């Protein structure tokens, strides 16, 4: 089915207000969920909203909590999220990293006691739109087996790197081949995964999203490389925030909350003039996209460039929502 942005935001707002969320908080949160969905990231927008409400109802998320700065060391700050709403807090933390970068050239905010930030790419994009390089990542509950194991002991720990090119170039990637959100998107659409995304119950690689969702044997991106990167990202976020590691979140909490996150902004224009920056970025992009194609009918893609078209299509033609997901939201 198709809905407008206003209809989608209104549905989110209604549910939030029914939980006695303050009007301004409900409006800002509904706006972020709707913008994420409008951008084409259904897995961490509309599809994730029922799960967000579940955690809100369970008390994992404290909607009136205010993040507090704990430590300030020039370009580096440490904050405690107080388990506030995840996407609103993350937006504030990247804004703070940008403020620090405007003073120091680089800004880093390490956040502890946070909630799921929904679409991590929103915060990298937020920095890149203002002309900054944006880098951020989060740890999570253990939802992926380390390489060589069957039991979940590491997080998917998504990493985002956004570059202020025209259009914005951005990598937004889980440390697994597919996020659990994308497994759900493909399952709801009745599709196999495009490449192997995990192991079946017999230990064989599989493209069946439902099987992986059930047994949790999701495949690390790049096999042992994604497993290793997940581990070091967790270590850095834990140390810089003085927060909880994947192990602590998994063993000590009843669900995924109290995670640790990193937000970095770099002001490129302190290091290079605008014309030179743009020319260098354009040369990189042209060099890549003019390579001989493996398939004449398939264009060479640059990461994140598809979001401009997805956003335009959704604004022109309406936002496609899975009927079952919409029904869940209406029932909340």
From Swiss-Prot:
Keyword Ribosomal protein in annotation: no
E.C. code: 1.1.1.130
Pfam families the record matches: Ldh_2 (PF02615)
InterPro entries: Diketo_gul_Rdtase, Mal/L-sulf/L-lact_DH-like_ah, Mal/L-sulf/L-lact_DH-like_NADP, Mal/L-sulfo/L-lacto_DH-like_sf, Malate/L-lactate_DH-like
Single GO MF annotation: 3-dehydro-L-gulonate 2-dehydrogenase activity
Coarse class of the protein's main subcellular location: cytoplasm
Highest taxon of the lineage: Bacteria
Reactions this protein catalyses: 3-dehydro-L-gulonate + NAD(+) = 2,3-dioxo-L-gulonate + NADH + H(+); 3-dehydro-L-gulonate + NADP(+) = 2,3-dioxo-L-gulonate + NADPH + H(+)
Subcellular location(s) of the protein: Cytoplasm
Family recorded in the similarity comment: Belongs to the LDH2/MDH2 oxidoreductase family. DlgD subfamily.
Protein name per Swiss-Prot or TrEMBL: 2,3-diketo-L-gulonate reductase
